[in-house]
């Protein structure tokens, strides 16, 4: 029997915003968004969506993308930084699906124009080992149900014409900008209680830097930027799904 492993990326900050009221994207609008995503061309902004509208629109988009992108291998959390949430007029994270074709391995080369509105972020993945993750309510409980923490350079794509005008539900509607990412060397979750608490502390206190090939600092962040502790994002995803 083959065991399915789920990857969960915990974005340091993918965020955006606006206001208004509209409805779930129509089938035609979702098809247009999917076509622009696949052709890497900016699409019209989904405007004025409620949380329910964003979730409905995300479902329509993913139904169209799945036949092209392969099986779902995990979920991503975005808008996980409270300061970013406030800046973009929302108070909660959002989630999207990751497909098998989105995950590259360390050393991969990716075109600079990999998306319509390409970005890069220092990030991390966790690999889920069993379904009991869905009952985890603390970071320590999360560690009991994952077997790897994986450094990850996420390469999201905001895909719309005016990314700064997206709100939280709008980010959900575009599947939280999921496009590509490069996974690094996995770190095994230790077996003993003491080592696991040490790992939790290290994840919260870690300093992450993204540099170019000349050593210039492009971006930086710390573990606590993700909901206070990175594995809180896993708890949130489990509850949101």
PLM regions and their residue ranges:
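A conserved acidic, glycine/proline-rich C-terminal tail/linker
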Residues: 233-241
């Amino acid at each position: 029997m083959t065991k399915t492993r789920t990857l969960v990326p915990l974005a340091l900050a993918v965020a955006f915003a606006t206001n208004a009221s509209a409805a779930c994207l129509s089938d035609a609008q979702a098809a247009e968004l999917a076509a622009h995503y696949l052709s890497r061309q900016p699409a019209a902004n989904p405007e004025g969506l409620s949380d329910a509208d964003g979730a409905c629109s995300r479902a329509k988009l993913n139904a169209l993308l799945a036949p092209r992108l392969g099986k779902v291998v995990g979920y991503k959390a975005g808008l996980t930084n409270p300061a970013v949430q406030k800046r973009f007029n929302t108070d909660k994270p959002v989630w999207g699906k990751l497909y098998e074709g989105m995950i590259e391995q360390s050393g991969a080369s990716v075109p600079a124009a990999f998306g319509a509105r390409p970005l890069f972020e220092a990030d991390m993945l966790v690999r889920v080992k069993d379904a009991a993750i869905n009952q985890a309510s603390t970071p320590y409980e999360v560690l009991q149900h994952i077997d790897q923490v994986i450094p990850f350079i996420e390469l999201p794509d905001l895909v719309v014409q005016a990314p700064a005008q997206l709100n939280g539900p709008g980010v959900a509607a575009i599947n939280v900008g999921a496009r590509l990412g490069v996974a690094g060397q996995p770190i095994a979750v230790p077996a003993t209680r003491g080592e696991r608490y040490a790992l939790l502390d290290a994840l919260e206190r870690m300093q992450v830097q993204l540099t170019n090939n000349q050593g210039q600092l492009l971006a930086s962040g710390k573990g606590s930027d993700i909901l206070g502790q990175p594995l809180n994002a896993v708890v949130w995803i489990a509850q949101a799904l």
